[in-house]
């Protein structure tokens, strides 16, 4: 395999040079033996994607189904109920047991992720808990060697506000210790009086 990284930060395109969800190895899309998609950080930022359901609506081969207050993803006729974070699975609601574990809509804000890898089709050969429909893997941002900081603010109708701050860099002169912090604050109103929600996320 080519010695390449799966990270998409500072990559100004909507394409990634590699992904690892299929085999656990950083393979280029051409080397990957399955149908795959990658939602890069550039696309997340350019299109203002803030949650997993919105990202999956923009992903080829994935159908987003919302019913009774829950969100589920469908791929090749099967529900994808194992959503990975850095390659580690987290069960969402509607799994084989039928127990409501976690709604996919409630997954962490996408501002903390570098990219989202999507594999269409079974991955059980390389992952013990693979599903026939496919696998979704959200890869988190990592600390950088060089200092960098960014902040953004958005405003919309019905008192909708969103603020994101991201700071990263080395913590010592030898650059052997690094850190990163991402903070998000969301506030959403409604056309109805006294209806709204406010949420915050901190990652570091």
Please place each PLM-identified region on the residue numbering.
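Acidic, small-polar-rich N-terminal luminal/periplasmic segments of exported/outer-membrane proteins
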Residues: 1-146
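Outer-membrane beta-barrel translocator/receptor signature
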Residues: 98, 102, 111-114, 120, ...
